[in-house]
Amino acid sequence: MNILAIGAHPDDIEFGCAPILIKEVRQGNQVRMLVLSRGEAGSAGTPEVREEESRKAARLIGAAVDFMDFEGDCHLEYTPENALRIALEMRRFKPQIVVAPHPQENQHPDHSVAGKLVRDACRFARYGGLVELKSMAVHRVGNLFFYNITQHLQKPDIVIDISDLISEWEAVMNCHESQVTSKSYIELQKTGARLLGLTIGTEYAAGLFTNDPVRLETISDLALSSRNF
């Protein structure tokens, strides 16, 4: 299975859903990270440094990573043209699952813009008549999920036990040395994961939000209860 994880900036994917991706890599799935900027507007770290930090983190995750140029950090625009560019990458990689930042407004506008672009791109990727995408065969994404970078969204639709991956996740986040030396971002993420874990009776957990209803063949797939306490 191919899984495409998309972030607006270097470190979004790593802080938002890296443990989930590590689990998938260990299951033998192919993971590609697609980053829409190099953090050009940030106060810490140059674009070159931040790109290298992402590449280092991707190696720990076991994923490939690529960067797209959308005029830089803080200049990501919600336009059909930008969604089409992302859709072309979807046709190229052919993911069955896509994960992206939640489109709900939060503290950085690029996160919500990225989520909206990816949502549209998933639709565009399956449209056969789009001349802008004619160079690649039509592809239908199976499911789109959104991850949360901050901790103030509503309760996630899917909660995944990541208790056995905390040290690996911390190592991935520490790859972004330029971003974690002055603020306790890692502790913030771990605290959020700990609180989410309490809701399912595990030490740590990560959440995903659905874009569409999740299709099942049988409810026995849901036999694992979150009520372990």
Protein language model annotation of sequence segments:
Residues 1-93, 221:
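Active-site rim/loop-helix segments in enzyme catalytic domains that contact anionic ligands
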Residues 1-4, 78-229:
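Metal-dependent de-N-acetylase/amidase catalytic core
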